[in-house]
């Protein structure tokens, strides 16, 4: 993976963790950050999806699209989006 791709994924995943701040526990957010620090981008995205699906957490469409774009880029779309299919849509308001 080249530097630009690495930096892009790091920034996008950290942004996703920030967007999900109210839906994640502090331990979950910390664990996701540790996975990103270790360049385990696919696992970080899968774990975020799993944590959200455990409680069927409502997810805004824009956040769901972020998951879809990232998982498509990383090649784990079926795994990530399958977990998120349990989560209802939340309003962005």
Regions found by a protein language model. Give the residues of each.
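C-terminal-biased regions
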Residues: 1-93
